[in-house]
A protein has these predicted regions:
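Short, extreme N-terminal segment that most often corresponds to the first beta-strand
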Residues: 1-27
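N-terminal segment of the canonical double-stranded RNA-binding domain
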Residues: 12, 16, 20, 30-107, ...
Length: 131
């Protein structure tokens, strides 16, 4: 189940970008799942001190980027055949208001997913004015 949550490093970067959606778990460098939802509720970055941060799911983060920044991703399966050997790779593509960026080809879906997430963070950081 841990692979459904984004890594700690990216969760910290998202906290800096203003991600504050309710999450079912949080990081204190390692992933922490509360035992009783009624006792702990959900976690938002606004309520968590440093170094704690919420632990969002990939789908949550991708929805946030889509709704807040109009950035969308797709991960496509690409097959190739060489010398009668069929291979499968995963290609991540970011749609930035009609400008498509291919982030590469990866052996696993999860690698493509993480690379897309890192690229989304990079895009938003590069377009955010510094204080």
């Amino acid at each position: 189940m841990n692979k459904e949550f984004i890594p700690y490093e990216q969760a910290l970067e998202l906290k800096q970008l203003g991600f504050d959606e309710p999450c079912f778990a949080f990081y204190d460098e390692s992933l922490y799942f509360p035992n009783n939802e009624n006792q702990y509720g959900t976690f938002c970055n606004q309520k968590l001190d440093v170094p704690f941060c919420s632990a969002p799911l990939y789908q949550q983060v991708f929805r946030w980027f889509r709704e807040k920044y109009n950035l969308d991703i797709s991960i496509n399966t690409v097959y190739s055949k060489y010398n009668e050997i069929l291979s499968r790779k995963y290609s991540g593509v970011i749609d930035n208001e009609g400008v498509f960026t291919n982030v590469g080809f990866y052996d696993t879906y999860e690698e493509a997913e993480l690379t897309c997430l890192k690229k989304l963070i990079e895009i938003v950081k590069s377009n955010t004015p510094k204080p």
